[in-house]
Regions:
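Phosphate/nucleotide-binding beta-alpha loop and adjacent structural elements of enzyme active sites
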Residues: 1-159
């Protein structure tokens, strides 16, 4: 689905901001859009180490913190599946009921910042995959949300 959206609107996309970049599964699709900056936000240690393979690309910027509606350290509940793919700042509730194979037995303290406080990060395409924390991320954009033309989010209707 994401690839179709990027293909359809790539002429209008002037930069990508991905919050919850994980290990960079979408980066190759982003790179098909020429002459844009790609900002990847990932605070979790294990996936971040894999994501760093893109550090050598001059148009890819890796930010080692999360985004939200505050500037502080928060607890990130780490899932035990696929390098923490379901990890979340929000304490799991129904997730473990609908996905009993996913366990949250660990956490990390991560840095979270408001996007509105960041400088020199431009893009009109926002991709969110933050396990229920989307509204807090959007609130942290404040007036900079007006610079976005596209918001793509992965969501679950179960929780």
């Amino acid at each position: 689905m994401l690839e179709k959206i990027l293909q359809k609107y790539k002429k209008n996309i002037n930069g990508i901001i991905q919050v919850g970049a994980h290990i960079g599964q979408q980066v190759e699709s982003f790179l098909e859009i020429k002459n844009i900056d790609i900002h990847l936000f990932e605070p979790q240690k294990e996936p971040l180490e894999i994501l760093k393979k893109y550090k050598s690309y001059p148009n890819i910027f890796i930010h080692e913190f999360g985004l939200g509606n505050t500037n502080k350290k928060l607890k990130l509940y780490i899932s035990d599946k696929k390098k923490g793919v379901s990890s979340s700042i929000l304490k799991p509730k129904l997730h473990t009921k609908y996905f009993p194979e996913v366990k949250f037995n660990d956490y990390e303290k991560i840095e979270v910042r408001k996007f509105s406080d960041l400088e020199n990060i431009n893009g009109n395409f926002l991709m969110l995959d933050v396990q229920g924390y989307e509204l807090e991320v959007l609130k942290g954009f404040e007036n900079k949300i007006n610079n976005l033309d596209y918001i793509y989010s992965e969501i679950s209707i179960k929780e």
